């Protein structure tokens, strides 16, 4: 998801997105630990998405 799309969402939607991404990251980590993860780039994408959501949340908190 692009940063511009994230900025249009409200705080509740961003928090829900963050919880969703953290759950997805947990699942991917478990798959990587057990050797079932085929597409390892997904870990990086999810980690980056989490950082983007947290950044937008912090920006909105400062407003």
From Swiss-Prot:
InterPro entries: Ribosomal_protein_uL29, Ribosomal_uL29, Ribosomal_uL29_CS, Ribosomal_uL29_sf. GO terms for cellular component: cytosolic large ribosomal subunit. One of its GO terms (biological process) is translation. Keywords: Ribonucleoprotein, Ribosomal protein. It holds the Pfam family Ribosomal_L29. One of its GO terms (molecular function) is structural constituent of ribosome. PROSITE patterns: RIBOSOMAL_L29. The keyword Ribonucleoprotein applies. Belongs to the universal ribosomal protein uL29 family. PANTHER family: 60S RIBOSOMAL PROTEIN L35/50S RIBOSOMAL PROTEIN L29 (PTHR10916), LARGE RIBOSOMAL SUBUNIT PROTEIN UL29C (PTHR10916:SF0). This is Large ribosomal subunit protein uL29.
């Amino acid at each position: 998801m692009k940063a511009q799309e994230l900025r249009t969402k409200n705080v509740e939607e961003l928090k829900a997105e963050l919880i969703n991404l953290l759950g997805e990251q947990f699942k991917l980590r478990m798959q990587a630990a057990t050797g079932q993860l085929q597409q390892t780039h997904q870990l990086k994408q999810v980690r980056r998405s989490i950082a983007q959501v947290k950044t937008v949340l912090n920006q909105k908190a400062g407003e």
